[in-house]
């Protein structure tokens, strides 16, 4: 700050600032809140200005969010929103395996399954979390350090920007595990990648690569994260060296198969994961954002968020009601199957068995649910 501006601040700034946070600053297990010095485009620290890093910290469960973590995220985004010295928010997670895989399946299966009135209250918190991200007074950058799946994809899409390491996978999981992606995905995906690709992602539940996410427009930038013999290389499990196959179909960003996949896996074993380029890209984006008029930037991202907000606000309450009632049958079954299954039995029910039973008019009963669990005979 130059001397003239500094003198004006000393003469005119309030001696005591009002605290606009809802509650005093707290630390929630599973959510990290860290203020890091902001840097300009030259890489120099800007005294008195910061970027907040809000990180999910549950790596043993792929950074899935518990109920307490959801509450912590709401408060964290509120605190960052109110912080006068904060320029941007970086939303990320601990480790290099997962940004977030959605709600905590153990909690879903063992507490919320069969408890629609409880899950309805949980969904109030979930909705408030998504709204806190969409309503943050600072630009929000999703730093994708690993897989962004299910509810993790939904909260990630609520951010303004996505920067990802290229080993990360993206996608939805709802219909495979007893739910529907109506916690934001069905609102955001058609806007971001088009109706057809949104239908593919939201119903088939097939993950796609960071390279494909970048091509589809759900991710603004990707960076390599795998080092082999000290050199960064592109994700060896994904086609990155050509755009079309012999029939003119786009294959860039698609997963490799056959011998190519086997060779890619061998290359993966030789490498090590290094997220330094991801951090560099995120810091550079933060520096670009700080090099703008603050209110003009705020107005710009508030306006550009409107398509997401319009869809989200139109649907979130009836989505909450349906998800609560769904805990009585399909969600109760799917989340239990995932929680109780293992590598040997699998973590999904036999879907055709359920469909055949329902086709015969079988009502939902506890016995039916038990018969569908992985390993049941």
Swiss-Prot record:
Xref: InterPro entries: ClpP/crotonase-like_dom_sf (IPR029045), Dearomat_hydrolase (IPR017613), Enoyl-CoA_hydra/iso (IPR001753)
Pfam families given in the database record: ECH_1 (PF00378)
Natural source organism: Thauera aromatica
Keyword Nucleus: no
MF GO annotations: 1,4-dihydroxy-2-naphthoyl-CoA synthase activity; 6-hydroxycyclohex-1-ene-1-carboxyl-CoA hydratase activity; hydrolase activity, acting on acid carbon-carbon bonds, in ketonic substances
Listed GO CC annotations: cytosol
Protein name: 6-oxocyclohex-1-ene-1-carbonyl-CoA hydrolase
Quaternary context: Homotetramer.
Domain of life of the source: Bacteria
Record-stated family: Belongs to the enoyl-CoA hydratase/isomerase family.
Biological process according to GO: benzoyl-CoA catabolic process; menaquinone biosynthetic process
Keyword annotations from UniProtKB, A to Z: Hydrolase
């Amino acid at each position: 700050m130059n001397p003239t501006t500094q003198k004006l601040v000393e003469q005119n700034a309030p001696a005591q600032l009002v605290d606009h946070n809802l509650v005093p600053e707290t630390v929630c297990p599973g959510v990290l809140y860290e203020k890091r010095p902001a840097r300009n485009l030259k890489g120099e620290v800007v005294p008195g200005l910061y970027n907040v890093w809000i990180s999910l910290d549950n790596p043993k469960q792929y950074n899935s969010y518990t109920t307490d973590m959801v509450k912590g995220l709401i408060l964290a985004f509120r605190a960052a929103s109110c912080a006068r010295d904060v320029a941007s928010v970086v939303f990320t997670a601990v480790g290099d395996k997962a940004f977030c895989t959605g709600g905590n399946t153990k909690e879903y299966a063992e507490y919320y399954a069969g408890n629609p009135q409880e899950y309805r209250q949980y969904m109030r918190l979930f909705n408030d979390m998504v709204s806190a991200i969409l309503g943050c007074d600072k630009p929000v950058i999703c730093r994708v350090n690993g897989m962004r799946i299910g509810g993790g994809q939904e909260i990630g899409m609520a951010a303004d920007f996505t920067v990802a390491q290229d080993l990360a996978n993206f996608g939805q999981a709802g219909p495979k595990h007893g739910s529907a992606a109506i916690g934001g995905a069905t609102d955001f995906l058609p806007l971001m990648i088009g109706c057809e690709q949104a239908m593919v992602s939201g119903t088939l539940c097939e993950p796609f690569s960071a390279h494909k996410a970048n091509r589809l427009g759900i991710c603004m930038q990707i960076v390599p994260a795998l080092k082999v013999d000290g050199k960064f290389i592109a994700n060896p499990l994904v086609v990155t060296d050509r755009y079309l196959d012999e029939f003119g179909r786009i294959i860039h960003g698609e997963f490799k198969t056959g011998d190519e996949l086997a060779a890619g896996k061998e290359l993966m074993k030789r490498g090590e994961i290094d997220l330094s380029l991801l951090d560099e890209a995120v810091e550079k984006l933060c520096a670009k954002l700080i090099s703008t008029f603050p209110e003009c930037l705020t107005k710009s991202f508030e306006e550009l968020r409107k398509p997401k907000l319009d869809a989200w606000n139109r649907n979130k309450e009836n989505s909450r009601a349906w998800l609560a009632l769904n805990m009585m049958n399909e969600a109760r079954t799917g989340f239990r199957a995932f929680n109780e299954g293992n590598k040997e039995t699998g973590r999904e029910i036999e879907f055709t068995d359920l469909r055949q039973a329902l086709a015969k008019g079988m009502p939902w009963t506890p016995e039916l649910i038990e018969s569908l669990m992985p390993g049941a005979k």
